[in-house]
Amino acid sequence: PMFHANAWALPYSCALVGTKMVFPGYQLDGKSLFELFETERVTVSAGVPTVWLALLQHMGQNKLKFSTMNRTVIGGSACPPAMIRSFQEDYGVQVLHAWGMTEMSPLGTVSTLKSKHLDLPKDSKLAIQSKQGRSIFGVDLKIVDDAGKDLPWDGKAFGNLLVRGPWISNGYFKGEGGDPMRKDEDGMEWFPTGDVATIDPDGYMQITDRSKDVIKSGGEWISSIDLENAAVAHPAVAEAAVIGIRHPKWDERPLLIVVKKKDSQVTREELIKFFDGKVAKWWMPDDVVFVEQLPHTATGKLLKTKLREDFKDYKLPTA
């Protein structure tokens, strides 16, 4: 019951309102999911991007449409904008992007549009939906630099994300790992999430990386998530991961690791060129590697520790 944020607390909230719950069990392939959704007439779903990737690929290859599903909550890891667009424009499914942690019991933020956003162009709305969103009642957020100094809510500065609230953990079982809490200059205690994020003037938070996954190049930070999101927008890319590879001059440089869609072809040069205009020049990957599959945790997140181990001796062409 305590596995992965206790199923996002859905067993409790659904029971409270008398909602039927449908569980897929171990059959998380696209075909099985689609058949389950249709048979059980699912209207609302919740899951991680990796699961929805398999579902959307199956539906796209077989030209299928949902008959009942109209909303989905996506969390667990950052949802690529291309996935949100596909759900909404190709299948008429409204996406709610959310973020939280088991330590937060579990919900922290939800990305819903404010009234002033409703008349914005589609791309502008998508940019807002792609953020993890605003904090729910009872949860406070802030971002700080490595010295603990508060950073501005300007949507540009990114730093270590801290949270606090009445139902947020202040430690671990039997004190494992020591006291995680951070005190600010006013003596307030904050829980460090391990995420790096920005917060815009409207309070929308966006995860740019896990602190351990940020690529530190020439003294600056590069977001692996932003690069992955840009890569999966390419029509030939099924899934992508970006890790930092040691570089003699820049300390680290990004390596893009790609799984191609079935029967699709794309070259290293085409993918690197695809980043033109989407990210800063110095963010662009130094190299691309194609693989059959990427490693994932039991909860569907990319297992970057395994990728870093597999590619620890990789030599970049720019090194």
PLM features: residue spans?
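AMP-binding/adenylate-forming catalytic core of the ANL superfamily
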Residues: S45, G165, N170-G171, M188, ...
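Acidic/polar alpha-helix N-cap and adjacent early helical turns
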Residues: D310-A319
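Gly/Ser/Thr-rich phosphate-binding loop
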Residues: L16, T39-G47, L56-A127, D140, ...
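Conserved beta-loop-beta connector loops within the AMP-binding
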Residues: S135-L162, M181, P201-D202, S264-R268, ...
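Conserved ANL (AMP-binding/adenylate-forming) active-site segment centered on the GW(Y/F)…HTG consensus within
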Residues: G92, S124-Q129, D154, W167-G194, ...
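Conserved AMP-binding
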Residues: P1-H4, S77
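Conserved AMP-binding/adenylation subdomain of ANL enzymes
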Residues: F3-T43, H58, L113
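Active-site glycine-centered loops adjacent to acidic/histidine catalytic or metal-binding residues
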Residues: G76, G100, G133, D195, ...
